[in-house]
A protein has these predicted regions:
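Detector for C-terminal structural segments
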Residues: 1-25, 61-70, 90-194
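Surface-exposed patches in mature extracellular/periplasmic domains of secreted proteins
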Residues: 1-2, 37-42, 81-84, 159
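Immediate post-signal peptide segment of exported/extracytoplasmic ligand-binding proteins
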Residues: 22-52
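Short, well-ordered beta-strand elements
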Residues: 48-57, 80-83
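Early extracytoplasmic/lumenal segment of secretory-pathway proteins
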Residues: 79-92
Length: 194
């Protein structure tokens, strides 16, 4: 639906931006010169169209989600590899573009700063924004910095919405789902509100 959960401050629905359309995907890949080889995998200039994605170990069902992505992308001629390893390995490998090209991740916070902490080049830098210690998208960093700098809540909300639009327009992210949260409380607990 968007870069942040629908319950997060500043959320904006990215309606129509993420449509499942395998036929259009095939057309776009054809236009870019990625043609199916004998095994159905697309190639261009002798290079196979394949990527490696991390397993988000702390997230339930990450492996199953990636398996489903592998299945769906294989149908259009794209190979997805799952990066093996524990959480420390996944985090280290995710900072190396040669090991992981697509990052499966999420952060469970609902404040305005979560969007900055996720994608700013000096925070988590989930986009690998500048793999050689440079900032690949200075405009994005500037937009994210504004979220943390603005004093008025309405201004911060507007900036968070602009960042979501930008992340979508640049195709930097692909929201898959909003992870459900389950709370268990004992009968003697009163007044609990998630």
């Amino acid at each position: 639906t968007s870069a942040i959960a629908h319950t997060a401050l500043g959320y904006r629905e990215q309606e129509g931006a993420y449509t499942h359309d395998p036929e259009r995907a095939r057309e776009l890949l054809d236009e870019l010169g990625w043609v199916p080889g004998p095994d159905g995998i697309r190639t261009r200039d002798g290079e196979r169209l394949e990527f490696t994605i991390n397993e988000a170990v702390p997230q339930p069902r990450s492996r199953e989600i990636i398996t489903k992505i592998q299945e769906q992308l294989r149908r259009i001629g794209v190979v997805i590899h799952l990066n093996p390893g524990d959480n420390a390995t996944q985090n280290a490998d995710s900072k190396d573009y040669h090991k992981i090209q697509i990052r499966h991740t999420m952060v469970g916070r609902a404040d305005y700063d979560v969007i900055k902490s996720m994608w700013h080049s000096t925070n988590r830098n989930e986009l690998l924004n500048g793999s050689d210690d440079t900032v690949h998208d200075q405009h994005l960093d500037d937009m994210l910095h504004q979220i943390a700098s603005l004093a008025e809540e309405a201004d911060r909300a507007a900036q968070a919405r602009e960042v979501q639009d930008y992340l979508t327009e640049q195709a930097y992210i692909l929201p898959l789902f909003e992870e459900p949260v389950v709370y268990g409380v004992q009968p003697h607990v009163h007044g609990f509100q998630p």
